[in-house]
Every structure is written in structure tokens, then in C-alpha cells.
Amino acid sequence: MAYNVSEKIISSHLVEGEMQSQSLIGIRIDQTLTQDATGTLAYLQFEAMGVPKVKTELSVSYVDHNTLQTSFENADDHRYLQSVAKKYGLVFSRPGNGICHQLHLERFGIPGKTLLGSDRHTPTGGGIGMISMGAGGLDVALAMAGEPFYLKMPNIVEVCLDGELSEWTSAKDVILELLR
């Protein structure tokens, strides 16, 4: 049976379960991302696991949400995130570098890889051929510790498009039209 791109990525990352629609599967996560509004709790949970270093190929801590310093709390969180990144082998992205989900695609996105992020816009990674999902902080912490991410095997449909895009039409326009 010939697999499409999504099925190939899932198959190559499958560590538990069967690739049957809606059955529970566990997949290996290659990359994680967090942002400062959700990352602090994720890293506290990761630290509680006692794992000496992240076990993903790449994990990035972005500071892009709570960048205004109206009191000490944000600055304390930012220092904590920076220290966790250094201690456990994460990349730290300072305030002002950009928005996590877009920046991650531009700098670290790799087609064929899996990405789990504690930001609801993480699925934008699908646009470059990644299996890319948003999740809670504990799920991201478990992925950084080398544990599989569990989900129901999605229903995968094939879409065949013919022709050429008109001027000023992009891939995003195509997907928005398909979803309408």
C-alpha cells in the first residue's frame, strides 16, 4: 500500500499501536517548542521527572507572549526559562526574536519531522510537511523526556488538485478554500 506524506511520517515515528483510523497510537516526537506563557509549567514538570537532558532532537523555549515588564513576575519567568534552557540543552529564544510558531518553521522546521508545542498555533508546521501538533505542558514535558505522544490515528484523506494557481494566489488560499 502506498502511503501519503502524513502516513509516511506517522509510520516512521510509530512506537506503539497500529495505523488504523481512530485507534490509539504513540509516536516519537523529534522537536518541541514552548512559549513563555505555557513553558514555565512545562519545564517545572520536566524538572520534576529528574531527566538530565532533553531527549528530543531539538527543543526550543521562546519568549514571545509576556514581553512587557510591568512587574517582577515576567522577568522572573524569563530568567527561569533561560536557566532551564542552559541546564537541559534547549535553545532559548529571547524576547523580540519573533512569534514562536512562525519563527520555529523558519529556523528549525524540517519536512518529515514531528513537532509538539505548547502553543495552539503549532499545527502551522503542517504547511512545510511536518506532523505538528499543539498540546498541554505535561505532554510537551513528557516528549522532552523521550516519552511517546499518544493520539488517535487521524482519518487521512487524499486530495488531488489539478491546474495552476492564478497570480497572487498562495497555498494558504488553497487550503482555506478546501476547508470552506
Predicted regions and their residues:
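Fe-S-dependent hydro-lyases/dehydratases of central metabolism
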Residues: 1-180
